[in-house]
Amino acid sequence: MSTSHHHHHPPYLITTLFFLFLNFSCLHANELELLLSFKSSIQDPLKHLSSWSYSSTNDVCLWSGVVCNNISRVVSLDLSGKNMSGQILTAATFRLPFLQTINLSNNNLSGPIPHDIFTTSSPSLRYLNLSNNNFSGSIPRGFLPNLYTLDLSNNMFTGEIYNDIGVFSNLRVLDLGGNVLTGHVPGYLGNLSRLEFLTLASNQLTGGVPVELGKMKNLKWIYLGYNNLSGEIPYQIGGLSSLNHLDLVYNNLSGPIPPSLGDLKKLEYMFLYQNKLSGQIPPSIFSLQNLISLDFSDNSLSGEIPELVAQMQSLEILHLFSNNLTGKIPEGVTSLPRLKVLQLWSNRFSGGIPANLGKHNNLTVLDLSTNNLTGKLPDTLCDSGHLTKLILFSNSLDSQIPPSLGMCQSLERVRLQNNGFSGKLPRGFTKLQLVNFLDLSNNNLQGNINTWDMPQLEMLDLSVNKFFGELPDFSRSKRLKKLDLSRNKISGVVPQGLMTFPEIMDLDLSENEITGVIPRELSSCKNLVNLDLSHNNFTGEIPSSFAEFQVLSDLDLSCNQLSGEIPKNLGNIESLVQVNISHNLLHGSLPFTGAFLAINATAVEGNIDLCSENSASGLRPCKVVRKRSTKSWWLIITSTFAAFLAVLVSGFFIVLVFQRTHNVLEVKKVEQEDGTKWETQFFDSKFMKSFTVNTILSSLKDQNVLVDKNGVHFVVKEVKKYDSLPEMISDMRKLSDHKNILKIVATCRSETVAYLIHEDVEGKRLSQVLSGLSWERRRKIMKGIVEALRFLHCRCSPAVVAGNLSPENIVIDVTDEPRLCLGLPGLLCMDAAYMAPETREHKEMTSKSDIYGFGILLLHLLTGKCSSSNEDIESGVNGSLVKWARYSYSNCHIDTWIDSSIDTSVHQREIVHVMNLALKCTAIDPQERPCTNNVLQALESTSSSSSSCTTYLSKILSLA
């Protein structure tokens, strides 16, 4: 009997496969729903997530930013740099069961991150990067067992670092830098035995550096800079044998440098600058043969640099400036083949500069200024052919400048002032094509300097030397901003080439032997701020064209042989503050306008035939010459009567014109039916009939918008501090039309309340349009606002403080011009995020307070980050924004701090310049902030040419 075999699948196998398929489908559907839920909570203006939608296939593996494994499960979500905003409302997306990587860095996401993100996220998660956003709130507690990388840097997180951070036992990378974290660095970090990279920089951490860090034997990178850490550096750090990078800068660390740091044989970067370290540098430090960059600057270190420095054969950068180091500069530095940057300035080094310095090095920057160095310059300094900065000022160096520097074509910045150099300039020195800054002042240099060819030159100071001959032709130096040739023996006339400086701001030719007339063409230098031609032999008249100067502040023509009358329109230069015309041959009357109104007697003395009706000038009064003839008497009487009549008529018009030009007109008073008395003060006559008290009060019911009979719109705002209004009205009287200031047209007040009426400009607030603005438009906004500030600070006397420079207070009109709505003190609420430290603490408001607010505005325009929520302000976020910016800028990660919508490839150099300016404007000490004129000059002088930006050189290249 034959037997047939039939194969049947057991029913339980079919059932199992069915449920597996069902489970697979459910998982797939669950992933899709979680991802779409994430998409619904954020804004995606550039439509990067357009592929995230229901479709016939519903295959999430094809979606932008999503990566799946070989069984089509989502393992990676990378949406970095997509310009997305909004909040992550739940941690649901983080629960995708196979998810290993989440990267949401470099966006504009904000708000707190979900509190359960570290307790409910997928246990498979290994990489979490939320850096460079605007997240706030505290860092959640919890534990992810397999997490390798946690990067929350460059956000606005607050609060303390919890001790349970120590349970993330698998972490290799922890970066919490660039936030507003407070409290101590937890010692529990020592439990992260596998950690390789630790960054807590640019926060507000206090206390000491925990000794427990010495247990983290796998650490390669420690960055705790830009905090408020104190105490001594733990010697236990010297036991971290794998350490490559140690950075503790900008803290309050004190005491000696532990000798154990010399045991870090793999160390390549050691940065301890800007602390309070003292004592000698341990000799063991100079045995670190792998060290590339060493920076102990800005401390109180003493002692000498040993010859052991010759062992550091990998060293490229040595920074020991601003300490109390003594002795000679060791010969050992000359044998460091890779040495590029040597900065030892502001110490007490003595003796000569090592004879072969530069011969066996690769020098690009040498700064030994402000020491006690003597002797001559080595002729080997530029042997590498790469030397760009040579800074040796304020020493006692002598002899001639070596001929080799005349052939150093790489030089860009040379500062040799305040030494004892003598002899002639080396051949070729005045034809170096890349030099942009040259200061040789206060030496004993001599010779003829009539040949000059430096096309990149921006600043030249040859003052206090013995140069002679005629003035050079600087026609090739179109970029010159400052030229100081004072206190030499230069003769001859001013050459025509001197009139062709489109950017010159400071011109000083004083104390020479220059002759001839002052060229009228000099007035074509529209950016000239300071002009000093004193103590020469100029003849002829003061050019009337000088009235065309637009920003001239100081004018000194004293001690010449100038004759004729002073041009009457010279006093019309609004920016002119100081004038000195003493000791000339001038005659006639002194102008009674502008800077001449308060001129000091010493500034006009020595002009025998000069007179003035201003007794404070010390000049004799101007007298009318009288004759005795009867005909003359009748002529005088008739003329006097005619003049009186003319004065009477003119006076009426002058008063009228004065009222109109100063925008001060009669006060309108009205009493309403309920007995309330109102006063309306107008500042422009054309609006006097535009609205009444009733229409002003009615506008308060219609979104505070007032429309006159011609359809012109105005905005009505309530004055917050009524008592301040009278003194504020005097401020408003100073304001005339300026294209970058919203015009205040009137005030309306009763005994209990007051309102301010200003024009309503068609356009949008800066806060509404900032995202996505091109660099060109941002530049225009910066310049427009600082021009408004210059008008308020420099053209109004006394100066007017703008007060509020937040993007909410700046309107971009239809012509793309920024318009500042004045926040006069006492009138409009200040935005605390833009408030200077002295204003917050002492209620002091000055022009330097405005500069601080402008600096914050620059940071906002550069980074796209703002700090305007009340919670952030109470936590000191605007201070943290500045600290974060300093941290980011000092490391020059331009792509991490610049707004992603700005094209850095074209404007990188200009952006870096503006960031540097922003940090100067936000200095804690008001005295360290630049004045408004300097801010404007800095903005105008920035160029968009590209420049290299390495990790550390950006800091050092801005120092000298």
Curated annotation (Swiss-Prot):
Family: Belongs to the protein kinase superfamily. Ser/Thr protein kinase family.
Stretches in topological domain Extracellular: 30-634
Boundaries of every Protein kinase domain copy: 691-953
UniProt xrefs under SMART domains: LRR_TYP
EC annotation from Swiss-Prot or TrEMBL: 2.7.11.1
BP GO terms, sorted: regulation of pollen tube growth; response to temperature stimulus
Enzyme class: transferase
PANTHER family xref list: DNA DAMAGE-REPAIR/TOLERATION PROTEIN DRT100, L DOMAIN-LIKE PROTEIN
Known glycosylation sites: 70, 83, 103, 108, 129, 134, 191, 228, 252, 324, 362, 372, 537, 580, 600
Modified residues (Phosphothreonine): T692
TM helices/strands, residue ranges: 635-655
GO molecular function, one term: ATP binding
Residues engaged in binding ATP: L697, S698, S699, L700, K701, D702, Q703, N704, V705, K717
InterPro entries: DNA_repair-toleration, Kinase-like_dom_sf, Leu-rich_rpt, Leu-rich_rpt_typical-subtyp, LRR_dom_sf, LRR_N_plant-typ, Prot_kinase_dom
Reported phenotype of the disruption mutant: Insensitivity of pollen tubes to CLE43 and, partially, to CLE45 peptides-mediated growth stimulation. Pollen tubes of plants missing both SKM1 and SKM2 are fully insensitive to CLE45 peptides. Reduced seed production at 30 degrees Celsius, but not at 22 degrees Celsius.
Ranges of the Cytoplasmic topological domain: 656-960
Tissue distribution: Expressed in pollen grains and roots vascular tissues. Present in roots.
Pfam family, one: Pkinase
Self-association and partners: Self-interacts. Binds to CLE45 present in the pistil, particularly under relatively high temperature (at 30 degrees Celsius).
Keywords for this protein: ATP-binding, Cell membrane, Disulfide bond, Glycoprotein, Leucine-rich repeat, Membrane, Nucleotide-binding, Phosphoprotein, Receptor, Repeat, Signal, Transferase, Transmembrane, Transmembrane helix
Record-annotated disulphide pairs: C61-C68
Reaction it catalyzes: L-seryl-[protein] + ATP = O-phospho-L-seryl-[protein] + ADP + H(+); L-threonyl-[protein] + ATP = O-phospho-L-threonyl-[protein] + ADP + H(+)
Record protein name field: Leucine-rich repeat receptor-like serine/threonine-protein kinase SKM1
PTM-bearing positions, type Phosphotyrosine: Y834
